[in-house]
Amino acid sequence: MSVPAVLAGIREAEAQAGRAAGTVRLVAVTKGHSLDEIRGQVLAHGDFPLAENRGQELRDKVAGLPGAEWHFIGPLQRNKIKYLRGVTLVHSIEEPWQAQAIADAAAEWGQAPAVLLQRHNGEGQKHGVLPDDLPAVLREVRATGLEVRGLMAMAPYDDEARAAQVFADTARQAQDLGLVELSMGMSGDYPLAVAAGATLVRVGRSLFA
């Protein structure tokens, strides 16, 4: 596949869900790909947000493509916070200390990223905030001064019905919490995520095939 093919798939999913074209943004996951590949196979087709899940690779690519919009989508340990300089959106906040560490570092950077809270999907997932804990975590993260835009969810890879349920539950809770951004869906399940209300879909391997 390619960026145009994925974009066509997103537009088709929007239409099938009765959503206006362009309401879903493609986030291009670039891990393992060179700057030349990113320029030639992704940015040649538009100024899409680019995303990494490894701190050092993110740092190096932000330096190489400083004009791009960068997102971080991986687990956050304390030693990764310093690599978030130049990032506009962090998708994977699951504990208030992470937000506080970002806010503290951003005071020196001069610009803070917005954040999403990662919602636990209940399927043995290692990361994410339990749904019942999200209201309290949201309050604590907002208290750090960071802008909380929405929720991020990862669905089971091999259960379409369960994936659709995870996406629907996440969208419903985001609405209940007054959050508008929904980072849901990857290469194999983004049509289901779009149908549930995703505003950001994280696609990697399909862009470079």
UniProtKB/Swiss-Prot annotation:
Ligase as UniProt keyword: no
CDD domains with a match to the protein in the record: PLPDE_III_YBL036c_like
PROSITE patterns for this protein: UPF0001
Keywords annotated in UniProt: Pyridoxal phosphate
Cellular component GO terms, alphabetical: cytoplasm
Top-level taxon in the UniProt lineage: Bacteria
Family matches, as Gene3D superfamilies: Alanine racemase (3.20.20.10)
Molecular function per GO: pyridoxal phosphate binding
N6-(pyridoxal phosphate)lysine PTM positions: 31
PANTHER family named among the record's database cross-references: PROLINE SYNTHETASE CO-TRANSCRIBED BACTERIAL HOMOLOG PROTEIN, PYRIDOXAL PHOSPHATE HOMEOSTASIS PROTEIN
Known function: Pyridoxal 5'-phosphate (PLP)-binding protein, which is involved in PLP homeostasis.
UniProt cross-references to HAMAP family, sorted A to Z: PLP_homeostasis
Family, per entry: Belongs to the pyridoxal phosphate-binding protein YggS/PROSC family.
This protein's name: Pyridoxal phosphate homeostasis protein
Organism field: Deinococcus radiodurans (strain ATCC 13939 / DSM 20539 / JCM 16871 / CCUG 27074 / LMG 4051 / NBRC 15346 / NCIMB 9279 / VKM B-1422 / R1)
